[in-house]
Amino acid sequence: MKIAVLALQGAFIEHERMLEKLGAECFEVRQLADWQQPKDALVIPGGESTTQLKLLKDLALLEPVREYIEHGGAVFGTCAGLILLSKHVQGEEFDRISTMNTEVCRNAYGRQLGSFYAEAEMNGVGVVPMTFIRAPYIKSVEAPAEALAVVDGHIVAARQGRQLVTAFHP
């Protein structure tokens, strides 16, 4: 399996290391030429969503990524990736990838000092370790999206077709 990892900013190295431990072949997407490589899936890592969005636009990657997902490409977005994939972000109106029927609250768990670790049941997976770093949470999902995990009454993982998002870092 060949996985493209968006490597513009954020925790892309950590995602690559884990994917490689699982036997996947990874390559970094830093520019449009990288995006042209064949891929089985895309990972959008945690980081700063506004910085990632600016770079996606500046590097002419936003539309190709959106089209890939809209045409059935598999994607996993963590933390900032969740924000970029969500159609709605509470209190914000600007263009994102916006392919997932979710509404998100940014930085919902507060500042860096509010970061925490939890373990919770994830539908179809079992108990999953979850690291929340200035994390968002999913306020609501609309069909065909479905909630997969809840922590303290907040949705922290969801899927829609071949899209998977988590508020936490795996």
Model feature map: region roles:
Residues 49-120:
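Cysteine-nucleophile active-site neighborhood
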Residues 1-58, 63-68:
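N-terminal beta1-alpha1 cap of cysteine-dependent amidohydrolase-like domains
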Residues 43-44, 77, 166:
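Redox-cofactor binding/interface segments in oxidoreductases and associated redox assembly factors
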Residues 35-38, 70, 141-142, 159:
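Flexible, charged surface loops at secondary-structure boundaries
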Residues 26-27, 75, 163:
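Hydrophobic anchor at the start of a short beta-strand
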Residues 106-170:
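Amide-donor transfer/coupling interface in amidating biosynthetic enzymes
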Residues 12, 35, 84, 91, ...:
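Flexible, glycine-rich phosphate/dinucleotide-binding loops
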